[in-house]
Amino acid sequence: MKKLLLSVAALALSFSSNAAETLTIGATPVPHVEILEVVKPDLKSQGIDLKIVEFNDYVQPNTSVSDKLLDLNFFQHRPYLDSFIKDHGSDLVEVGGIHIEPIGFYSHKIKDLKDLKKGATIAIPNDPTNGGRALLLLQTAGLITLEDPKSISATPLDIKDNKLNLNIKELEAPQLPRSLDDVDGAIINTNYAIDAGLNPLKDALFIENADSPYVNVVVGNSQSVKKDSVKALLKALQSDKVKKFINDKYNGAVVAAF
C-alpha cells in the first residue's frame, strides 16, 4: 500500500508543472479504466492529457483525491461516496454520473437460488454501503427480511427473518470472486465480477434491477472540480460515443446513466 501511495504521489508531483493541461484520475480496471480509455483521444485533441492510475480497492482512490495527489477518481457509486464523506469529513465533490453496475449473486456450487440449503454461507462486501446493498438484494430475492426493508446501510445484525439460517460472511469486495470456491454464494460488484471473467447476465443467479440508484460517479475535490479540463472530461464521458461503447462492450451488464 505504501509503495502504491508513493507512486501516486510521485505521479502527481511529476505532472504539477503542467497541471493546466494534465488531468490525473484514479480508477478501478473494469469498466472504469476501459471507459476512460475511450475518451482519452478526444481529450488529447483538446490539449488535455488524461493520466489514469489503476486501483484495486475502495479507499485509496478517495484518499488520493482528498489529499490532492490526484485530481479525480472514478470507481464508486453515490451512496458509497456519501458514506465516505460522512465518515472521513473530506472535501470530495461529485462531478457527474456515468453508469450503473447491477450487483449480482454468483455461485460455483448451485445453479438456482432454490437449491440453497439451510446454513449456507453467503459472502457479501464488508463496506457499509455495498454490504447494505447486498442485503437488499438478498431481501429482493426472498432469502431474508430486514428490520428496515429500505435501508441502504443495513448490516447482518439488521436481518429480521432468515428462514434458511444463512451465514452471512463479510469480505473485502475485491476478494469476493476468489471466495466462490469456499462459500455457497457471493454477492459481487459488477466491476469485480467482469474483472474475474464472470458475465453478470449469464453467470449471476440473481441480479439487481437496471433502475438501481447506485450510479457510478466521477469525483473530484473542492479545487480540482473548478478546472475546465474536468468539465471537458465529463462532457466526453456523457457522450453518445461512450453510451454506444458501454452498450456494445458490456451488453447490459453495465448501463449508461446519462
Describe each region flagged by the PLM.
Residues 53-63, 150-178:
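Short helix-initiation/N-cap motifs at beta->coil->alpha
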Residues 1-19:
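Gram-negative bacterial Sec-dependent N-terminal signal peptides
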Residues 132-139, 237-257:
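Periplasmic-binding protein-like
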Residues 95-144, 243:
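A conserved helix-loop-strand patch within extracytoplasmic ligand-binding domains
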Residues 83-95, 110, 182, 187, ...:
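Ligand-binding "clamshell"
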Residues 54-58, 68, 72-82, 98-99, ...:
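Beta->alpha turn/N-cap motifs
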Residues 102-113, 215-227:
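A bilobed periplasmic-binding-protein/Venus flytrap-type ligand-binding module shared by bacterial periplasmic
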Residues 20-30, 48-54, 121-122:
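Short, well-ordered beta-strand elements
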